[in-house]
């Protein structure tokens, strides 16, 4: 069969030179259509640190048979459990893990996507395994019942998920005859039926076909070699010449509109969303009419719709743009995050939205506005860094079904032609007669509960008197909203910088500014060809986290800074110069990233705006509500996540439990916050880092000018960000409002040197796949099952976690500990080449630089904050280079046999 496939290469069709890629891409591309009609995109990148592949099947939950809702999702699970040439369940997962890789899949309404990434040297054997999913999966009956339970466990884990509950409510306002409105996740009641295996095989044979598939492969090999590897393996996929799987029914039943669906949220949040069906715009995507409209409606600058709603105390945020939709059925949405006051005035908000639409129709369709969007789109495309291999193959494999290969990268990205009439036509669809109104709020009084999720809703046709009022508003021009002026931050970013030879590239920042209370680092950008900078400024003070109250107020202060500067920073962000303030345990970090020419003026303006004015009552009320919602979201998170948060908080002296934070929040009023705000800005230490296209002298001058703008106080006590000492074994028990039970076990290494941290990472890489296979696939303890390594600051930790609908916490913890206690023996029995593959893969990651400028900046800033020497990385390289398997087994035995263990249990009572 391989020989036949190789011969068929000559009749494959290919396209190479005309694929337009982002300006900085050094990758080579080739599009093929194999003889079996499989669409293929090959990407050659000799310098990649990961190879990756994604197969997108143009089949999803929309194609489920009525008798078995969730069957497409169930098939996705089953394909991982053995093929004709690799029949052992878990073999594929183990192979990917052994090559320092990752894998996953997802089932969407129209698509099912399978993907992986791993060590580039292992791409060919990985594709050997991956291809058989689509040629000859075993669909082994022995795994059917077990995997139905896995699907059900996944379904149960998301029963309280806020996004899932809201989505379920939205579906109640859509066309009930469109399968998108139906249940697609699958559970015991929809799948555990007679005839499931036959239905599964029938679905695979009737829906999966090469002509419905698209494959993207990225590797270090030349294109000709990639073509040979792919053609030999994937030409064997059967082409059943199936017709298009697109559902030709409309997503919205226009006869039901206008319609209202109200729902109670899982957390304390309030949102108003208007959904309008609109025509498919793919034929004129380069004119971007909906993007243009969304840009004006969602603008956050002074005088904008959002700014006015905030000023009246009605809203916290607003977004607008193309939204819910299928291939041939689209929608446009305007979504407003409401305050309690805004909820009571939601009709007023709807009327003002409709008046703003009319304002755009009459005075807002301008060529210069389109040109602004075009300039920044062109710049972003020109200077886009190479995307993560796994992300790029997953993204492109779905697009291959509907986008000409030469436009894969430009589709929806580059703007070409201003079309006044087209924008006008799209605006004409945004009318109250064709509107689905979604309201989410705790105050809603429900009349029913949806079938598969505990979503409480109330739905009804929009009342005539309200429709009349909305129709009148749609004819009026807003008298309070002002459309944005020309953006002063939009500047031509220049040309790509010349790439520097590796031997001269700087990899460590230089301390170029040091004074009492201030420390500044500069790294000259000469690796990524970017006319961009990353700038970090930390306002360092114990007031950030020396009590639960301080921790809450530090969060509120960073929110207040973002709020006060939003009108300015939003315009800068549109121009590719981003800013945000974020609270940390050591202070508040001001982070800037973007085109250097636009970024430096932004930094100056932000620093000149500090300290911000004391906030007024209206702003305080909104910030309080947002913080309350944030705390509520933490409490609504799944048990496995909450346990991890609780247990890691115990390990950090400057972190606090959820109960402590909730109590602190309740004790803070505006006057207390004002006192905190004044104290914070009375003085602090600072540390800065500039990574960009500047010389050392230029960088030093900038740092000096920024320090002069800040109230530096060298007497401010310094902060040591570290972990609490721990010993022995400890158990913590919690009880949450969730039907599942959970356990998390942490193995804490008391050695914090660089070598111990990298050995911990290697241990996490080695245990991840077997832990998952035994406890998730074989024992079916729970859908959420994982083991991983992570450093908590400089402390190495191994953790295992399971969330289960059936087992109790003691059983889960015992299962986790049994896996870790057998870990050393497992590695000892492991073939030497398997261990070497993991060791060398991790070593390659250390030796290869980060793939983007932002990743390098973040890594350096993290090291600065943790007071890590920049030489740590080379110490870790030395540890791995000399490491033998016997030495690593001895390390594991010492670590696991004399453990420092912290356990956390959640019981549903």
What do the predicted segments below correspond to?
Residues 1-7:
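Sec-dependent signal peptide recognition
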Residues 11-14:
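N-terminal signal peptide c-region/cleavage motif recognized by signal peptidases
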Residues 23-54:
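Mature N-terminal segment immediately following signal peptide/propeptide cleavage
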Residues 37, 55, 73, 114, ...:
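Buried hydrophobic packing residues in well-ordered domains
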Residues 47, 52-117, 182-185, 299-317, ...:
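M16/MPP (pitrilysin/insulinase) zinc-metallopeptidase core fold and M16-derived inactive scaffolds
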Residues 81-85, 117-148, 328-385, 542, ...:
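M16/insulysin-pitrilysin zinc metalloprotease superfamily fold
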Residues 94, 125-127, 138-179, 190-198, ...:
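Non-catalytic accessory/assembly modules
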Residues 216-219, 369-526, 643-706, 719-726, ...:
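C-terminal regions of mature proteins
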């Amino acid at each position: 069969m391989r020989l036949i496939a190789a011969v068929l290469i000559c009749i494959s069709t290919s396209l190479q030179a005309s694929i337009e890629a982002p300006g900085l891409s050094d990758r080579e591309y080739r599009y093929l259509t194999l003889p079996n009609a499989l669409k293929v995109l090959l990407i050659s990148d000799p310098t990649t640190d990961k190879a990756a592949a994604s197969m997108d099947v143009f089949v999803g939950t929309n194609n489920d048979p009525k008798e078995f809702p969730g069957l497409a999702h169930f098939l996705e699970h089953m394909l991982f459990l053995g093929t004709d040439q690799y029949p052992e369940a878990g073999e594929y997962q183990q192979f990917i893990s052994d090559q320092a890789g990752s894998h996953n899949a997802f089932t969407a309404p129209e698509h099912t996507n399978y993907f992986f990434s791993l060590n580039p040297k292992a791409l060919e054997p990985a594709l050997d395994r991956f291809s058989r999913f689509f040629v000859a999966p075993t669909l082994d009956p022995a795994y059917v019942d077990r995997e139905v339970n896995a699907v059900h466990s996944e379904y149960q884990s998301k029963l309280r998920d806020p996004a899932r509950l809201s989505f379920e409510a939205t579906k109640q306002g859509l066309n009930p005859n469109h399968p998108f409105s139906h249940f697609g996740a699958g559970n015991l009641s929809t799948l555990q039926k007679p005839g499931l295996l036959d239905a599964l095989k029938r679905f695979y044979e009737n829906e999966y076909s090469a002509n419905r598939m698209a494959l993207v492969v990225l590797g270090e090999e030349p294109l000709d070699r990639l073509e040979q590897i792919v053609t030999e393996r994937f030409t064997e996929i059967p082409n059943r010449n199936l017709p298009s799987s697109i559902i030709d029914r409309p997503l919205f039943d226009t006869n039901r509109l206008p319609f209202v669906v109200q729902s109670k949220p899982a957390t304390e949040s309030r949102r108003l969303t208007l959904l309008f069906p609109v025509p498919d715009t793919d034929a004129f995507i380069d004119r971007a009419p909906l993007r243009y409209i969304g840009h004006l409606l969602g603008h956050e600058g002074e005088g904008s719709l959002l700014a006015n709603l905030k000023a009246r105390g009605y809203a916290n945020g607003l977004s607008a743009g193309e939204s819910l939709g299928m291939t041939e059925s689209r929608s446009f949405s305007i979504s407003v995050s409401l305050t309690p006051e805004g909820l009571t005035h939601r009709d007023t908000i709807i009327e003002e939205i409709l008046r703003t639409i009319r304002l755009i129709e009459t005075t807002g369709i301008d060529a210069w506005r389109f040109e602004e969007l075009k300039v920044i789109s062109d710049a972003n495309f020109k200077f886009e860094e190479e995307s993560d291999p796994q992300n790029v193959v997953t993204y492109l494999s779905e697009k291959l079904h509907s986008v000409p290969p030469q436009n894969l990268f430009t589709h929806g990205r580059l703007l070409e032609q201003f079309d006044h009439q087209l924008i006008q036509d799209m605006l004409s669809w945004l009318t109250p007669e064709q509107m689905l109104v979604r309201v989410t709020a705790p105050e809603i009084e429900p009349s029913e509960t949806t079938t598969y999720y505990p979503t409480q809703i109330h739905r009804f046709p929009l009342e005539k008197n309200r429709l009349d009022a909305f129709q009148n508003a749609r004819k009026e021009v807003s008298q309070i909203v002002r459309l944005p002026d020309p953006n002063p931050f939009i500047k031509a970013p220049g040309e790509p910088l010349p790439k520097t030879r590796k031997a001269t590239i700087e990899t460590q920042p230089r301390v170029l500014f040091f004074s009492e209370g201030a420390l500044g680092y500069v790294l000259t950008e000469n690796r990524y060809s970017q006319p961009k900078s990353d700038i970090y400024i930390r306002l360092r003070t114990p007031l950030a986290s020396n009590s639960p109250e301080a921790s809450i107020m530090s969060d509120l202060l960073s929110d207040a800074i973002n709020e006060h500067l939003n009108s300015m920073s939003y315009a800068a962000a549109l121009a590719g110069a981003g800013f945000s303030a974020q609270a940390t345990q050591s202070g508040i970090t001001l982070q800037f990233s973007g085109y250097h020419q636009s970024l430096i003026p932004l930094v100056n303006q932000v620093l000149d705006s500090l300290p911000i004015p004391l906030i007024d009552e209206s702003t305080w009320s909104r910030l309080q509500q947002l913080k309350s919602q944030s705390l509520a979201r933490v409490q609504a998170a799944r048990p496995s996540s909450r346990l991890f948060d609780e247990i890691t908080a115990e390990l950090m002296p400057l972190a606090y439990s959820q109960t402590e934070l909730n109590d602190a929040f309740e004790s803070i009023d505006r006057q207390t916050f004002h006192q905190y705000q004044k104290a914070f800005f009375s003085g602090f230490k600072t540390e800065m880092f500039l990574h960009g296209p500047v010389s050392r002298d230029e960088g030093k001058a900038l740092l000096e000018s920024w320090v002069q703008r800040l109230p530096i106080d060298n007497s401010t006590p310094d902060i040591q960000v570290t972990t609490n000492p721990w010993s022995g074994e400890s158990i913590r028990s919690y009880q949450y409002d969730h039907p599942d039970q959970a356990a998390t076990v942490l193995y804490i290494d008391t050695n914090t040197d660089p070598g111990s941290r990298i050995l911990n990472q290697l241990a996490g890489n080695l245990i991840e796949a077997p832990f998952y296979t035994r406890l998730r696939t074989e024992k079916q303890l729970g859908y959420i099952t994982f083991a991983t390594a992570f450093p908590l600051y400089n402390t190495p930790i191994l953790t295992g976690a399971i969330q289960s609908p059936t087992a109790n916490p003691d059983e889960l913890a015992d299962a986790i500990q049994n896996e870790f206690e057998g870990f050393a023996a497992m590695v000892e029995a492991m073939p030497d080449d398997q261990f070497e593959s993991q060791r060398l893969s991790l070593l390659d990651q250390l030796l290869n630089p980060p793939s983007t400028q932002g990743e390098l900046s973040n890594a350096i800033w993290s090291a600065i904050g943790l007071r890590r020497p920049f030489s740590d990385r080379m110490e870790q390289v030395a540890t791995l280079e000399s490491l033998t398997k016997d030495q690593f087994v001895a390390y594991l035995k010492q670590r696991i046999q004399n453990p420092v263990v912290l356990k956390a249990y959640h019981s549903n009572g």
